């Protein structure tokens, strides 16, 4: 398909474990996607042989996940599907244990989130409880600037639910109240009763829920606002990997977050100030005259060794607001998952775009109200779970970050400690290291 045909939208699927994310996603890809029929037949046969019939769609996704984890060559078209109006890419495999980290550093910004809810008694309640993932994922999506959301009330076919309008209304009300607290406007969000396994209200209107008059999933997807891509901003391209390719040379790989990259440009890398000329740009083994935000590309540079640049560095245009190393940065942080108290001096690892670097909480300036941003306490001694605060951080090693308002993907981060995401942050000011 030519690049110009349909607008491209990045989709993230969030929600509690076992809410049916994989089954529903698998079903969508299966019915509207680029999966080769032969591949599906092979998966179906294996699925039946292993007695996994009921997981047919999730099984498709599991096989894709396994292929994705084996190497970078997996055919990314497998994660795409099309509707009448848009071309969708699913940008993270739900259920992945690093899902929260991936959502933040994610190789891309999601334009829309599908929040998957399990409707059966007890399952919805577990997901929305204090330690359920529904709340955490919704809060994350909003904090990270995913403004559009579609809610799917899944497993409506389960016998305790049986497409009950009463159960639908009960869940819709409780979820609306929570989403409003987070910052979403529930009246702009479709709440769709579906069965991810049977396909009710996904691509065709179900006769099982005649009381439901809203959009079905495919209609809600087509009704999304097309995302604005920041083509006119200066280039920022965080490196995911750097390869040395015989006969070609050094090839950094990453996703264009803002601006454009094209052959002939003088590329400056931060934080290490290496400058090199971009010789060529390619995507899916095709040479491009230029790459724009959202494109995952490799580009060839001359005169720079693989040792000089690495994952976590940021490529920019040497002649247009080049990226620089950050000396300190000031940000709003939300503590989500920390067992104790966080005080000045705390030095966890930050995952920001593709960088993974320890940073010190130098000063905790204010504890603030998450929704209004107003100060609740100045210079608090410590902050704990559920708190939002304004803090100054100092990287322990060279790091390039940006202000969230200017370069969103380089201005949000996950705080990692004890193998989990303990906090998320959004950068408000950056003190750059000069020359």
Swiss-Prot record:
HAMAP family assigned to the protein according to its UniProt record, in alphabetical order: EF_Tu_A
Say yes or no: keyword Protein biosynthesis present.
yes
Q: What is this protein called?
A: Elongation factor 1-alpha
GO CC terms:
cytoplasm
Record's subcellular location: Cytoplasm
For the ligand (GTP), the binding residues are: 15-22, 92-96, 154-157
Name the domain of life this protein comes from: Eukaryota
Organism of origin is Tetrahymena pyriformis
